[in-house]
Amino acid sequence: MKTLLLSLVVVTFVCLDLAHTRTCYSCTENICLQHEQCQDGQDVCYKRWNTTYLILTDVVRGCAKTCPTPIEEEEVYCCLKDNCN
């Protein structure tokens, strides 16, 4: 009986951990307080911005399956924890 109970606890823990959905900041402003629950398979939080000017411009934050590739004069920061972007 104890073995069955322990097995159920382990299975429940594993299933709950696999069902975790990443949460990332999602906005287009420098200061961001808006969160987004990422879709299944989107485990990367990212922040991309234009480096043409001295100040951060064209900042975009959100969820992705993989880290976005920066385009010309753009930088991208990616991370794998909730709201790390």
Swiss-Prot record:
Q: Which Pfam families match?
A: Toxin_cobra-type
Gene Ontology MF, one = toxin activity
- Signal among the record's keywords? yes
Keywords (A to Z) from UniProt: Disulfide bond, Secreted, Signal, Toxin
Give a brief account of the tissues where this protein occurs. Expressed by the venom gland.
Report the SS bond pairs. Answer: C24-C45, C27-C32, C38-C63, C67-C78, C79-C84
Q: Which InterPro entries match?
A: Snake_3FTx, Snake_toxin-like_sf, Snake_toxin_con_site, Toxin_cobra-type
Localisation per UniProt entry: Secreted
**Gene Ontology CC:** extracellular region
The leader peptide range reads 1-21
**CDD domains from the entry?**
TFP_snake_toxin
Protein family: Belongs to the three-finger toxin family. Ancestral subfamily.
The entry's protein name is: Toxin 3FTx-Lei1
Q: Which organism is it from?
A: Leioheterodon madagascariensis (Malagasy giant hognose snake)
